[in-house]
């Protein structure tokens, strides 16, 4: 009731002065503060632990996908190839198609007959955000089969935030936005390895060595096609992917635990600071 304004919200000095604050006795204040501080410390320690686990995972990935460290039992040579040789199609949306038909058809909420319009902010590694900002009618999207996302493939950010690489998991059909490079592989099972390799040091160095700097940072489709990928044998690839997946699962469980702690803290604040729950 004290907030005013439509474009910019504000609170008047007088309204602030009239705000009623419930003040318990000093010893109870201290108990409440100490209880919340304990939870804060728990949350902060868990955040540090998660950061440490992520750093370890990143370091492990760099060592394994470059071949600097080999898992026990593997010593075969790695093959060097290019993304172009691994793919039946490497492409992107054209500006003409976007202006002529795609952009006018976009809607900001999912409707019957629409599919997600995936932008380069909507993907990273194995995560795809299907609940994105825009959706496109399928009858429009199907006119552009090359950029229709209806199979497991690679997505690469090629404009603005370049270097971001993900596996499109095909959990549902979607459509690629203009800043997204699409690499459709002959063997979709290679998508996870290619993503990990291009996300590692060697892959990122290649990507950024090809960037074109103008109004935005850009990669061309030709740049994407010539990206080199080093491939170990299938069994070694699967073993490396498995090790990193286990680490990802552990981190996900820790993040889930963190969210629970944060909810607990919010609940404690609502109960303790309103006096609904009193500490003895």
Place the predicted regions along the sequence by residue.
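Amphipathic alpha-helical coiled-coil/heptad-repeat segments
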Residues: 23-77, 228-280
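A short glycine-rich beta-alpha junction/loop motif
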Residues: 3-27, 109-112, 158, 173-181, ...
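Sequence-specific dsDNA recognition surfaces
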Residues: 84-108, 121-151
